[in-house]
Curated annotation (Swiss-Prot):
Function according to Swiss-Prot or TrEMBL: Catalytic subunit of the tagatose-1,6-bisphosphate aldolase KbaYZ, which catalyzes the reversible aldol condensation of dihydroxyacetone phosphate (DHAP or glycerone-phosphate) with glyceraldehyde 3-phosphate (G3P) to produce tagatose 1,6-bisphosphate (TBP). Requires KbaZ subunit for full activity and stability.
Protein name as annotated: D-tagatose-1,6-bisphosphate aldolase subunit KbaY
Xref: Pfam families: F_bP_aldolase
Binding site for Zn(2+): 83, 180, 208
Keywords: Lyase, Metal-binding, Zinc
Active site: 82
Biological process terms in GO annotation: carbohydrate metabolic process; D-tagatose 6-phosphate catabolic process
Enzyme class name: lyase
Listed GO CC annotations: cytosol
GO molecular function: tagatose-bisphosphate aldolase activity; zinc ion binding
Amino acid sequence: MSIISTKYLLQDAQAKGYAVPAFNIHNAETIQAILEVCSEMRSPVILAGTPGTFKHIALEEIYALCSAYSISYDMPLALHLDHHESLDDIRRKVNAGVRSAMIDGSHFPFEQNVTLVKSVVDFCHLNDCSVEAELGRLGGMEDDMSVDAESAFLTDPQEAKRFVELTGVDSLAVAIGTAHGLYTKRPKIDFQRLAEIRDVVDIPLVLHGASDVPDEFVRRTIELGVCKVNVATELKIAFSAAVKEWFNENPQGNDPRFYMRVGMDAMKEVVKNKINVCGSANKLVLDSAVVL
């Protein structure tokens, strides 16, 4: 098995009407917890790391872990650069073996976003690396980046059409009412806007900020063309809450093998639910056209 591009995973999801879950990773334990479930449920998966992730643990170390797990779990893995903002940073990581990258220029004006994304697409496509970009801007907290409500804005369908045509990007993250992190009130998802984007854009669409969104809302977005669902905050909360509870019950405890496993098991329950919501169970493809 190997580290692969997300392009083929998302094309299969688009053709068959499901979504591939993209789970944010932080260390060996989070990777292992995710893959234990995905292997058991035979679900394709995208392991996403933000720039902050790669400051915590070097790309080369994460890549080595993912390569080893791909063999031991007998499944191809997509290691994805989530919310990266620099061509130079992406270039270095693609040269190290990564085959999936998100370039986030959503904070720039439209034309500047296009220019940045096009430069990344031109480089990545020469290296069999798929590219995701974002148009519109989600509010909330992602990594060490905070976007307030006044700075967030939704994706315009006609701009999305033009953006995809100008950049040649492989997948598009859209802003339709979700936000990074947890919600203080029930989110208002603009399903009509999503449908209008789907009508004019033929590449896979991506839902960011899916943590804490009602399952029925996520399923509806998949029906309307979302092929990749990002989950981060719910995983961290489940892991951390379980570890805190373990220490409350075992105040003298000090063995990471015990409390890490408790955290991993709690995270696994979230992963199972998200796979069921995405409809990706038993969708793992091992065909040579997918595994590069």
